[in-house]
Amino acid sequence: MDIFREIASSMKGKNVFISPASISSVLTILYYGANGSTAEQLSKYVEKEENMDKVSAQNISFKSMNKVYGRYSAVFKDSFLGKIGDKFQTVDFTDCRTIDAINKCVDIFTEGKINPLLDEPLSPDTCLLAISAVYFKAKWLMPFEKEFTSDYPFYVSPTEMVDVSMMSIYGEPFNHASVKESFGNFSIIELPYVGDTSMMVILPNKIDGLESIEQNLTDTNFKKWCNSLKATFIDVHIPKFKVIGSYNLVDTLIKLGLTDVFYSTGDYINMCNSDVSVDAMIHKTYIDVNEEYTEAAAATSVLVADCASTVTNEFCADHPFIYVIRHVDGKILFVGRYCSPTTN
């Protein structure tokens, strides 16, 4: 969650959408070739050996592509290449066709949702380029009826409001909790997909209460909040939205302590005999949330059957909120902030 917090704090008032799973995967690739303090700093983000194929099931599609492109004139070590397999490719960064080929690969992988990934020429001095792309599409376990979607006010701030297309579902059982913390009070709800993934939505009680929650959004806190969920009959209102994100993660990761990973400070002796540096780490994302499904690119948890009460509550996301798409095992696939309906 720390990468999301850092990006969110530097992009106040803007929508944010990233895939921690994808970012972790590409940092793991760099870790395989790192040495010394570079390897030590990257180890915090090393992805555990997990089979992401289990995320995919009927009505769900999740796939992740991570690539590291190295300059063709450099000689990369067999030990490094053996660990990453087809995730690595040597290219000529001075050839304009290289960018076209990379963009086409990502475009096909994300089914046209991210194009282009690289929208400007690379420096002729580029030695290494790390990219990540993710595609996710899943149907809601309980779809929103299109006939209930209507224009509804969304409060960007206490004094600013814009109309959005608000999806609604009435009187269904969802896992939900009202949370009280020293830094703010909020509601959290789980909107399950068919299969083993779900979207968690964190909605502050106050229109302008999201920032303090973001600052305290840690893995530990998030797990605690999820464990407090109880099945409740509830009316749910959430906007239809699309968000496109584009990030060069280098500065963000340096701020998080990866000071010896990028540029000339990186020690990748286990990757290549010659000096190489990681000059860019591009992360582009796309998400489309509508009545039938969620489609996401970067590049259902079990619902408790017993409800304690038949009293219907309401969860109305009519002001800025955080959303997290996760697998039933707790792995976070995506995390985002929706606060500005007019920017995407």
UniProtKB/Swiss-Prot annotation:
Stated induction or repression of this protein's expression: Expressed in the early phase of the viral replicative cycle.
A Pfam family of this chain: Serpin
Matches recorded under Gene3D superfamilies: Alpha-1-antitrypsin, domain 1 (2.30.39.10), Antithrombin, subunit I, domain 2 (3.30.497.10), Helix hairpin bin (1.10.287.580)
Keyword hit for tRNA-binding: no
Signal peptide (from-to): none
Location in the cell: Host cytoplasm
Residues flagged as site, Reactive bond: D306, C307
InterPro entries named in the record: Serpin_CS, Serpin_dom, Serpin_fam, Serpin_sf, Serpin_sf_1, Serpin_sf_2
Keywords tagged on the record: Host cytoplasm, Protease inhibitor, Serine protease inhibitor
Main localization of the protein described in the UniProt heading: host cell
GO molecular function list: serine-type endopeptidase inhibitor activity
Tree of life domain: Viruses
A GO CC term attached to the entry: extracellular space
PANTHER family recorded: GH10112P-RELATED, SERINE PROTEASE INHIBITOR, SERPIN
Family designation: Belongs to the serpin family. Poxviruses subfamily.
Known role: Viral serpin that inhibits both cysteine and serine proteinases involved in the regulation of host inflammatory and apoptosis processes. Major anti-apoptotic protein which inhibits both intrinsic and extrinsic pathways and strongly cleaves host CASP1 and CASP8 but is a rather poor inhibitor of host CASP3. Prevents the proteolytic activity of host interleukin-1-beta converting enzyme (ICE) and ICE-like enzymes. Can also block apoptosis through host tumor necrosis factor (TNF) receptor.
Name of the protein in its database record: Serine proteinase inhibitor 2
Organism: Monkeypox virus
